[in-house]
Amino acid sequence: MRTSSLLTLALVFVACEQEYDIINEPVDVDPADVTECDFTQVESSDFFAYDCNPVFQGTGEAWSGDIGSIGFHTTQVSGHPFYQMWYTAEATSGAAYELGYAISPDGTTWDTHPANPFMRATPGAWDQDAMDAIQVLWDEDESLYVMTYQGYTLPTSDFDPGQWGIGIATSDDGIRWGKHPANPVIDFNDPSLSLTISPCWPLTITKRAGSYISYVGASVPPDPFFGGEPRCDVYTAVGNGLASWSFASNPALTAGDWYDAAGILAADIVEFDGQFYMFYIGFESWTPTGNGGVITATSPHVAMATSPDGSFWTKWPGNPLPLSGEISPSPSAIGAEVVGSRVHLWVNDYYDSIQENAVGYFLFDPNREEA
């Protein structure tokens, strides 16, 4: 089975080139001072929901349909936060997917790039059917954006395993991307890998002490006689560059509570107030898709874990997190960015009010007082 801010900031796209200065000075702006709507505390917690969610939905771009996976990054432009979003969407061109790019001065109002889309599915490629679970890292050492994603070609029968793996794409401007020639850099069908670990999908990527660290949902191989469904725990893989990865032998975070009984579907990690925070989406169970033994994650919930060093994690006792006000929530992707004294969160979820997937905006702000 396989698993599938105070200054009005004008940011102008010109000929696909960057027209801004990046600085490294910290900034601390209360988002409620610069956004159209306020934030409301969620159930006496340290989380606050934007009152005008969702902030990003079907963009109306001619090329795109429903929003799929999302990735975020924040930099400083003239002392103020500048938000970047990358997103995959169903393509009206007939391609399985295409990649779009949008920017925002406040995290809520987004301008899509006029030259979207920038990457699309290539027929016959190993990743022709999907580009899911995207995460974007800005590598300061190399002055390079690094994107990880799950790609696959779906099986055509019960005897066809399809092709599954983790792909890498890089960009020097966040707009023009090139896929790594060694893709998939982690091949889920690699027999030597499947003896010890069975990857589910990529979760997020960081860089510490000069090494890339990828967090991957993975399980132990199923029993050869009795089979069974995988449980996608969180494992780390250290990269020797971007093409060669070595997995840890033990999980960094183990699923298995009721809200993540079957595993972790998506995650993002930030360093905040002296420790690491993982914001993740766990799920309760699997559902067969009827397509060549492929199963899909169902009954998802947003949760959180902490770690002193990013190696091993402790789940938040208040899990799951109440970061959805919808009747039938179905969170599928999450992005986290530290700006000043708070963590900004974006969650891709199903919104009953518009009957489609869209991105909601939240704050994790332990020092904020509700008026």
What are these regions (language model features)?
Residues 22-371:
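Carbohydrate-active catalytic/glycan-binding domains of CAZyme proteins
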Residues 13-15:
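C-terminal motif of bacterial Sec signal peptides marking the signal peptidase cleavage site
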Residues 1-9:
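Sec-dependent signal peptide recognition
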Residues 17-19:
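Bacterial signal peptide processing site
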